């Protein structure tokens, strides 16, 4: 408003504009700092270390990249994992994250700033969340102006859902992918608003980066066509839309096909078909508009019938080809994860390995509150704000939020995609609400200050229409607002920036609220924001900062650290032969290869179900059969995670049913029912003999009873069923301090004595092991 | 020739290092003066000799012992059997006939305590074996000698017994023997339990980085192995936790590092992260760091870790004769640790010159360049290498170099200029017109468009001013209703009228200007509309004003006036709304 009232044209306006710009740049820098520093709780509370499972793999790949260079990286065949199959890392990994971190590391080192690869990896995620919040600013600014942009950026900087995936150390694809996602959307909207081919090209490049970074790029390549279709259907077709879409599909697909892990999938799989279909449609529509332009209305009608008939034929052929293609591929051209998005029950029915991952489960209601907190309430208001007036850009964000809400409802992991949409919507909502309230206050204060002596005016705050014209923009009123705005923090400091101000004035006229009401509402909004900030800081500090390889517990005599995982990985890496093979459930595969540098049988990249099923079968078989399976796989050590002594709930016994299910899915002699007593999973004296004789049970509870004399399992809260037993084919070689990780070595086969060999043979031929031997490809 | 009139040997085997202290009384019984003295060891000991120092001690008083070490070198074995290693000591002054000299010899041997049996289970005790000679092996005749072996306070499995062998507590004594020939030798074997930690660093890299900003940063990378009897069979955590003493006695859990006083920013980690099991005690004399490896080390087990700490520069850096020198200890601060291969890298600040090193014993020296924080020329690194290092080597080394303080500022200045250049480029980029072709249509169109925008802004500001004057008019009306001063009100009207006229005059050329641009064709109608609307609003306002003033002149009631202007008022509001809409539209351009 300042700009409008300036007595002199030119300089003051320019000054104020510049001031507004500088202020918003400053606010953006602060938002970046906020986004970075709120993610440092994990470093401060724990240490600068890579977190969890997948980040360890990415870290290892980055180490390889920084050591051996990019060409070696593309050709890397990793023989440390999936023994004896190995894995072609260069062709099966989304390289965006590793290349990003590798480039940062290389850049810093060529400037002689000696940061270790680990440090770079740890801090990549926080840095990129700062970028992501800036991208959110840009996107929201395109949709609803810079005020909303700043609000959305501030919200995104600390939204818990995103923090959960991007705390320092959480070196995962999502860390950079969310930035790439938002930035791609921004460039799409920017192209849509400007119709500039320059931005369209940038958009394709951003899309390429997204394809490099994360499998979630299919979200983009489906959402944008949907929006294009929506625009066409609602009669919003324009050349700008064409420029925004057509180059993206052509360039984007070509670029995507360059990424080895995507390759020809970019044109072959069903996830991408929507974009091609819409590509055809938009050309048809463009042609129609063009013809409409050059023909007279009469001729146009004739042409329409012609084109429609030809178009129908073409469409029919294309659809037929698509259907044929889709039908010819086994899963209907859809990958398992995508299918489970379309049909939420798909995974649990057909692919237990996808269903067994907790982040692929549908979220619960509390997790929405936990992850996006008050944004959940602001989103509807934002959607309403987007409809007044509805532009191309705002219709896009509405579509975005609707789709992401659906996807987040299917998989808890995709809550991450919802978070930026929720932030944008809430940013818009907050900004509009602040505009309305501050506008009302300013108007009211302006009115009263203008006629302080006027007796009539003091009493009548409600006769708004009359005062409307006369009130308002005296300098005094403005000053008051400015003072207030500076007090109320950054969300309103952008008020002096002139652009939204005019809008605010309109709003003010349309919806002038009483002074008290708007002050109260403002206070409530600020409180809401404060609660959000408090929640986010709490979530960042308490809920999402644990690196999960180090556990802590607060007891009366201070902080207790459980560092068992690294203890045993360190033991493995220093005290076993460098080529020894370690078998464990696939959860620990990445960590074992990265931290212990030992070859594993299966890891978290669950690409070979049969192999995982083999390990699952071994774990659920009796000792002898398990020994044979493991021995056939060259395994020397078996690693089990056991939480019964200290009460660590996510141990192997609790995951055991998934091993049985996955194993049973491939080797039918493993039956889930054998491990359940009346449909209940138990390990106490009521447990089935199959359960009590399984390798997992034995390795977990070997000599456990001697700790307290009863064998009380603190996770299952019961005494174990089989207490005293000996291992014949395995020997304990290492158990960590809190017993969380136990390592066993396969005993070498005994020399065959005549009588004994016979006995053994008869046993195996009758027992389960012979079956498994037949089924198991490695025997 | 020389004769040893008295030899006392004390062997301390309470730790993993066999530390031998000898007092030799040398008498020159020959006719010529002698300036060299030969020390001999059996080969199996000589090969494991880690440290040897010989000092003359004159007189018997303990306080008189001088600390000057004599130079010792490995001598060639002329005519001696292969099973003997010889070291020759240069005497401080030639020993003339009949003179006596007392020499104090300290020797430390590693790997001479052989674990036997070589593999034990978790529950067994750790037994080691020492081989020595009960008689002093010397090229000279020995008149009187004795040997005492200090064993750890634990079980003694067996030892070689002679008639004058005595075991007193944990001290084993052989001798005294009188008048023995040169090269007399009688092997003894002692087999005993050792509770010492057989911690050996296979490789230790100490990096000492000097920063003239006030810090000496020490980083030490240890590859530690337990060199005792190897563990065979299972390792049971249960046994280890429940009965640690019998079931894990051969393992060690802790290492104690005695760091220099005022050490700060201490960390203890390995390549997969921080190791949380460490404890630090510090006072003004020393800093003690008790570190516990991730897992207890049994025989044959290995581990790797890094310790780092900062030290105040003033404690270690001194100046002498225009040069600076760093005076810092050579070996590892961990007690009772044997280092098989020690590499000390002293990283001096960038720009150091004339580097020289003095060490109290022979080490392998070389120089490297290290590039660290924003270096251009790199930092000179003095690399010192030594094999088989024992705690006795923990003596100070001096690194001399020249360094000018101006070099300190180079890196901050570089940073400052870097940022300065960055900002300057930003300023130039935003200010400068960097389009390639100044005559291209798009460039011209852009220039034109800029002009259009500027004009638009002017129009806007004028309209705003008009609106402000309108407000003043309204204000004057309100004043009227309060004070009833018709004259002032009229005057206000007049002044606003003239003001508005001026403003509309100003507007006219702008409008014409705007219309002349083809690129502004879609804007100019809107602007024209705005101007027209504004004019209308002016008229309406004037009319209203006149009506109200007239009403006051006629002294009609307020309600009456209000009724009369009601319709006008509505129109004014509508017009005003339209103008604002238009303004907003223009604004969005």
Swiss-Prot record, chain A:
TM region(s), chain numbering: 18-38, 125-143, 146-163, 175-194, 197-211, 217-233, 239-264, 273-292, 306-326, 365-387, 394-410, 415-436, 519-539
GO molecular function: dolichyl-diphosphooligosaccharide-protein glycotransferase activity; metal ion binding
Coiled-coil residues: none
Membrane topology note: Multi-pass membrane protein
UniProt-annotated site: Important for catalytic activity, residues: 165
Stretches in topological domain Lumenal: 39-124, 164-174, 212-216, 265-272, 327-364, 411-414, 540-779
Tissue-by-tissue expression: Expressed in the root and in the shoot.
Motif (DXD motif 2): 172-174
Keywords assigned by UniProt, alphabetized: Endoplasmic reticulum, Glycoprotein, Glycosyltransferase, Magnesium, Manganese, Membrane, Metal-binding, Transferase, Transmembrane, Transmembrane helix
Sugar attachment sites: 597, 604, 608
Protein family per UniProt: Belongs to the STT3 family.
Function per UniProt: Catalytic subunit of the oligosaccharyl transferase (OST) complex that catalyzes the initial transfer of a defined glycan (Glc(3)Man(9)GlcNAc(2) in eukaryotes) from the lipid carrier dolichol-pyrophosphate to an asparagine residue within an Asn-X-Ser/Thr consensus motif in nascent polypeptide chains, the first step in protein N-glycosylation. N-glycosylation occurs cotranslationally and the complex associates with the Sec61 complex at the channel-forming translocon complex that mediates protein translocation across the endoplasmic reticulum (ER).
Name the UniProt record assigns to this protein: Dolichyl-diphosphooligosaccharide--protein glycosyltransferase subunit STT3A
Record organism: Arabidopsis thaliana
Gene name, Swiss-Prot/TrEMBL: STT3A
């Amino acid at each position: 408003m300042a700009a409008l009232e300036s007595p002199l044209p030119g300089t003051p306006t320019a000054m104020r504009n510049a001031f507004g710009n500088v202020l918003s740049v400053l606010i953006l820098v602060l938002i970046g700092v906020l986004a970075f520093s709120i993610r440092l709780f994990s470093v401060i509370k724990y240490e600068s270390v890579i977190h969890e499972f997948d980040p360890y793999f990415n870290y290892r790949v980055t180490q390889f990249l920084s050591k051996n260079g990019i060409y070696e990286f593309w050709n890397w065949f990793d023989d440390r994992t999936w023994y004896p199959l190995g894995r072609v890392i260069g062709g099966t990994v989304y390289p965006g994250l590793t290349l990003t971190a590798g480039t940062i590391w290389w850049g810093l080192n060529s400037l002689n700033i000696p940061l270790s690869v680990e440090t770079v990896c740890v801090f990549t995620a926080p840095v990129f969340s700062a970028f992501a919040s800036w991208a959110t600013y840009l996107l929201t600014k395109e949709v609803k102006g810079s005020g909303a942009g700043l609000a959305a950026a501030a919200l995104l900087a600390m939204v818990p859902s995103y923090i959960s995936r991007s705390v320092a150390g959480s070196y995962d694809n999502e860390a950079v992918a969310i930035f790439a996602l938002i930035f791609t959307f921004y460039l799409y909207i920017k192209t849509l608003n400007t119709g500039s081919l320059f931005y369209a090209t940038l958009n394709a490049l951003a899309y390429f980066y997204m394809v490099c970074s994360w499998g979630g790029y299919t979200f983009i390549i489906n959402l944008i066509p949907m929006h294009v279709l929506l625009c066409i259907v609602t009669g919003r077709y324009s050349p700008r839309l064409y420029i925004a879409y057509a180059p993206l599909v052509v360039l984007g697909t070509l670029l995507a096909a360059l990424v080895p892990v995507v390759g020809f999938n970019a044109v072959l799989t069903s996830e991408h078909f929507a974009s091609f279909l819409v590509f055809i449609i938009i050309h048809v529509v463009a042609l129609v508009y063009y013809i409409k332009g050059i023909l007279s209305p009469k001729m146009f009608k004739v042409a329409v019938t012609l084109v429609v008939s030809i178009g129908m034929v073409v469409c029919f052929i294309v659809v037929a080809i698509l259907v044929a293609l889709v039908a010819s591929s086994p899963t209907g051209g859809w990958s398992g994860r995508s299918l489970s998005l379309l049909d939420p029950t798909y995974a649990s029915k057909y692919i237990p390995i996808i269903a067994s991952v907790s982040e692929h489960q549908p979220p619960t209601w509390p997790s929405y509150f936990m992850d996006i907190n008050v944004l959940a309430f602001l989103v509807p208001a934002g959607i309403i704000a987007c409809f007044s007036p509805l532009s191309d850009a705002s219709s896009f964000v509405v579509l975005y939020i609707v789709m992401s809400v659906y996807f987040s409802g299917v998989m808890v992991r995709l809550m991450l995609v919802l978070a930026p949409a929720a932030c944008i919507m809430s940013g818009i909502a907050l900004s509009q609400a602040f505009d309305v309230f501050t506008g009302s206050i300013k108007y009211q204060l302006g009115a009263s200050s203008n006629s302080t002596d006027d007796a009539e005016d003091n009493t009548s705050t409600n006769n708004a229409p009359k005062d409307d014209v006369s009130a308002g923009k005296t300098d005094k009123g403005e000053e008051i607002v400015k003072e207030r705005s500076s007090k109320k923090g950054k969300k309103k400091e952008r008020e002096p920036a002139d652009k939204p101000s005019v809008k605010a004035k309109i709003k003010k006229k349309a919806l002038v609220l009483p002074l008290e009401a708007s002050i109260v509402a403002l206070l409530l909004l600020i409180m809401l924001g404060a609660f959000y900030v408090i929640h986010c800081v709490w979530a960042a500090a308490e809920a999402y900062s644990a690196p999960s390889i180090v556990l802590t517990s607060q007891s009366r005599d201070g902080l207790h650290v459980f560092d068992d995982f690294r203890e045993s990985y360190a033991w493995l890496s220093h005290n076993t032969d460098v080529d020894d093979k370690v078998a464990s459930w696939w959860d620990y595969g990445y960590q074992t290869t990265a931290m212990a540098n030992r070859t594993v049988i299966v890891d978290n990249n669950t690409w070979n179900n049969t192999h995982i099923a083999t390990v699952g079968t071994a774990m659920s078989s009796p000792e002898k059969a398990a020994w044979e399976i493991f021995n056939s796989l060259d395994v020397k050590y078996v690693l089990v995670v056991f939480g019964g002594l200290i009460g660590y709930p996510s141990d192997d016994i609790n995951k055991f049913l998934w091993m049985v299910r996955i194993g049973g899915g491939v080797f039918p002699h493993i039956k889930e029912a054998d491990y359940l007593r009346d449909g209940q999973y138990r390990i106490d004296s009521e447990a089935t003999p199959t359960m009590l004789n399984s390798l997992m049970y034995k390795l977990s509870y070997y000599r456990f009873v001697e700790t307290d004399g009863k064998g009380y399992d603190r996770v299952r809260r019961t005494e174990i069923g089989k207490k005293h037993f000996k291992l014949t084919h395995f020997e304990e070689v290492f158990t960590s301090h809190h017993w969380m990780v136990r390592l066993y070595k396969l005993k070498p086969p005994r020399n065959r004595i005549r009588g004994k060999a016979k006995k053994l043979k008869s046993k195996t031929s009758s027992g389960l092991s012979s079956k498994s031997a037949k089924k198991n490809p490695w025997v | 020739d020389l004769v040893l009139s008295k030899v006392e040997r004390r062997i301390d085997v309470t730790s993993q290092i066999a530390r031998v202290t000898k007092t030799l009384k040398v008498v020159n019984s020959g006719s010529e003066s002698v300036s060299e003295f030969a020390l001999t060891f059996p080969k199996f000991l000589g090969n494991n000799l880690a440290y040897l120092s010989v000092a003359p001690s004159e007189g018997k008083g303990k306080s008189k012992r001088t600390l000057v070490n004599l130079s010792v070198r490995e001598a060639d074995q002329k005519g001696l059997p292969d099973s003997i290693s010889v070291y020759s000591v240069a005497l401080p002054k030639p020993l003339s006939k009949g003179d006596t000299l007392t020499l104090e010899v300290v020797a430390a041997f590693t790997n001479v305590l052989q674990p036997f049996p070589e593999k034990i289970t978790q529950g067994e005790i750790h037994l080691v074996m020492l081989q020595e000679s009960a008689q002093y092996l010397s090229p000279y005749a020995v008149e009187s000698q004795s040997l005492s072996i200090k064993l750890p306070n634990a079980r003694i499995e067996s030892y070689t017994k002679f008639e004058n062998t005595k075991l007193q507590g944990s001290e084993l004594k052989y001798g005294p023997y009188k008048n023995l020939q040169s090269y007399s030798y009688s092997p003894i074997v002692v087999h005993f339990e050792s509770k010492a930690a057989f911690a050996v660093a296979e490789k230790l890299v100490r990096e000492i980085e000097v920063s003239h900003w006030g810090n000496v940063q020490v980083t030490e990378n240890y590859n530690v192995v337990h060199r005792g009897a190897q563990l065979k069979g299972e390792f049971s955590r249960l046994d280890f936790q429940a009965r640690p003493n019998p079931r894990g006695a051969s393992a060690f859990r802790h290492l104690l590092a005695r760091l220099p006083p005022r050490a700060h920013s201490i960390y203890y980690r390995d390549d997969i992260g921080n190791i949380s099991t460490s404890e630090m005690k510090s006072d003004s004399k020393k800093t003690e760091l008790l570190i516990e490896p991730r897992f207890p080390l049994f025989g044959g087990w290995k581990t790797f870790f890094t310790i780092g700490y900062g030290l105040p520069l003033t404690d270690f850096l001194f100046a002498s004769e225009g040069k600076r020198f760093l005076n810092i200890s050579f070996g590892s601060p961990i007690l009772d640790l044997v280092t098989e291969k020690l590499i000390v890298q002293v990283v001096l600040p960038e720009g150091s010159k004339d580097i020289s090193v003095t060490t109290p014993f022979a080490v392998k020296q070389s120089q490297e360049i290290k590039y660290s924080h924003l270096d251009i020329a790199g930092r000179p690194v003095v690399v010192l290498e030594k094999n088989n290092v024992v705690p006795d080597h923990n003596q100070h080394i001096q690194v001399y170099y020249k360094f000018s303080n101006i070099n300190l500022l180079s890196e901050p200045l570089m940073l400052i200029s870097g940022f300065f250049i960055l900002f300057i480029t930003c300023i130039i980029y935003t200010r400068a017109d960097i389009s390639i072709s100044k005559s291209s249509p798009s460039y011209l169109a852009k220039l034109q468009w800029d002009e259009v925008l500027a004009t638009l802004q002017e129009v806007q500001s004028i309209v705003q001013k008009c609106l402000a004057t309108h407000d003043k008019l309204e204000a004057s009306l309100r004043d009227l209703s309060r004070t009833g001063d018709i004259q002032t009100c009229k005057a206000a009207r007049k002044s606003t009228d003239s003001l508005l006229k001026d403003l509309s005059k100003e507007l006219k050329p702008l409008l014409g200007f705007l219309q002349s641009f083809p690129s502004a064709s879609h804007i100019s109608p809107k602007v024209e509309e705005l101007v027209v609307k504004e004019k209308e609003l002016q008229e309406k306002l004037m009319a209203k004003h006149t009506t109200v003033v007239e009403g006051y002149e006629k002294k009609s009631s307020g309600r009456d006036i209000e009724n009369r202007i009601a319709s006008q008022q509505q129109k004014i509001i509508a017009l005003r709304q339209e103008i604002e809409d238009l303004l907003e539209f223009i604004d969005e351009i």
